[in-house]
């Protein structure tokens, strides 16, 4: 009896923050949901072949945005969410169920920046709980997720309207703002955390701000992989478009076992925690799914 092991090959590179990351090489390894053909050859001649289907990948909970009862769409309903939340509290229009040409199904999510107490409140949608008290909002990032396969990308539909910064003072570290142009952002992160990571934003300076493209570990535990999309211009036309955001791995081998293992975040302004961005930015998102 002969056996064979199929393992992915990885391409190593350095990201913009100078950190080493890895991406799987297409055509190597076995990935969820894909079909494969295996052949046995002797002296260059195929003597046996077989096809097999890898087990299906995982579903992102309510990634189709079809349920109007999701906590992210309500006002002050994200404090105990089990997956999708938003900053809807002092203002209720940061995340709403909506419709848009090109969406999948009957509904999508609409994120829209608002003015709250004279400051920018970026439209947002995230896998986090959210609590608003004493004029401050606390987003606690991280949801339990039982990983069974490594994704190569996050696929979704989106449409963004992005303008120039017109609210707030640009922070010192502002590489995501170029020539005064705001940027929206979508990211997905595989983490191995023992607790949620809290980011607090209010009338003063934010605390707990983090960027998965700049760190492979937080106080809560390792950041295993991330995918990030910065959107610096308005999407052409009126219809949503499909995008695949590649996942880059800091750690190629560890399977997350922590209490909190997934973060997805969408915001109309990359520096929304600092109350900096364009009042007028709008982003529609729908049909979140993994690519393997």
Predicted regions span which residues?
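Surface-exposed, short loops/turns at beta-strand junctions within beta-sandwich domains
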Residues: 25-34
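Extracellular recognition modules
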Residues: 37-41, 263-265
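Extracellular carbohydrate-recognition regions
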Residues: 49-88
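Short carbohydrate-recognition loop motifs
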Residues: 99-120, 124
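Solvent-exposed strand-to-loop "edge" motifs in beta-rich extracellular domains
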Residues: 112-116, 144-146, 157-163, 170-177, ...
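Extended extracellular/luminal ectodomain segments enriched in beta-structured repeat modules
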Residues: 146-155, 160, 164-166, 181, ...
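Extracellular carbohydrate recognition and processing domains
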Residues: 195-256
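Extracellular carbohydrate recognition
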Residues: 237, 254-257, 269-292
């Amino acid at each position: 009896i002969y056996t064979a092991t199929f393992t992915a090959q990885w391409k190593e590179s350095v990201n913009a923050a100078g950190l080493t990351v890895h991406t799987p090489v297409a055509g190597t390894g076995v990935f969820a949901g894909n079909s494969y053909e295996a052949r046995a050859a002797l002296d260059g001649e195929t003597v046996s072949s077989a096809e097999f289907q890898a087990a299906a990948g995982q579903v992102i909970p309510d990634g189709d945005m079809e349920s109007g009862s999701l906590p992210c769409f309500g006002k002050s309903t994200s404090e105990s969410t089990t997956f999708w939340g938003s900053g809807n509290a002092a203002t209720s229009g940061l995340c709403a169920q909506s419709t848009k040409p090109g969406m999948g199904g009957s509904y999508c999510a609409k994120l829209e920046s608002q003015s709250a107490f004279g400051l920018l409140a970026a439209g947002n949608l995230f896998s986090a709980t959210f609590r608003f008290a004493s004029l401050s909002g606390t987003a606690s990032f991280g949801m339990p997720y039982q990983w069974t396969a490594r994704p190569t990308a996050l696929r979704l539909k989106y449409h963004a309207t992005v303008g120039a910064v017109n609210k707030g003072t640009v922070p010192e570290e502002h590489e995501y703002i170029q020539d005064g142009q705001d940027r929206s952002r979508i990211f997905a992160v595989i983490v191995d955390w023992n607790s949620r990571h809290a980011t607090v934003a209010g009338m003063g300076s934010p605390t707990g701000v983090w960027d998965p493209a700049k760190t492979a570990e937080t106080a809560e535990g390792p950041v295993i992989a991330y995918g990030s999309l910065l959107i610096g211009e308005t999407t052409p036309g009126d219809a949503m478009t499909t995008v695949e955001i590649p996942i880059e791995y800091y750690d190629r081998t560890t399977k997350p076992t922590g209490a909190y293992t997934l973060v997805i975040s969408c915001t109309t302004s990359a520096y929304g925690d600092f109350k900096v961005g364009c009042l007028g930015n709008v982003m529609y998102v729908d049909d979140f799914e993994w690519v393997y």
